[in-house]
Amino acid sequence: MKLKITLTKSLIACRFNQIKTAHCLGLKKINNQVIKDDTPAIHGMIKTISHLVVVEKVSYTKEQK
């Protein structure tokens, strides 16, 4: 299972660790989307910036690239 993570709010005025977490996930601008594996490490990152992102579960295959 994969997670589609969308940055919905700005990183301006966020704490430094929240900005770094968003960048590590690959989110730099509003409405950026990334697809990541559903792992405990990713869940921890999402928990850190949960007020800034929207998370959806997707079933992802190679044909959908």
UniProtKB/Swiss-Prot annotation:
One of its GO terms (biological process) is translation. Keywords: Ribonucleoprotein, Ribosomal protein. One of its GO terms (cellular component) is cytosolic large ribosomal subunit. InterPro entries: Ribo_uL30_ferredoxin-like_sf, Ribosomal_uL30_bac-type, Ribosomal_uL30_ferredoxin-like. Pfam families: Ribosomal_L30 (PF00327). GO terms for molecular function: structural constituent of ribosome. It comes from the Bacteria. Part of the 50S ribosomal subunit. HAMAP family: Ribosomal_uL30_B (MF_01371_B). Belongs to the universal ribosomal protein uL30 family. This is Large ribosomal subunit protein uL30. It comes from Aster yellows witches'-broom phytoplasma (strain AYWB). The gene is rpmD.
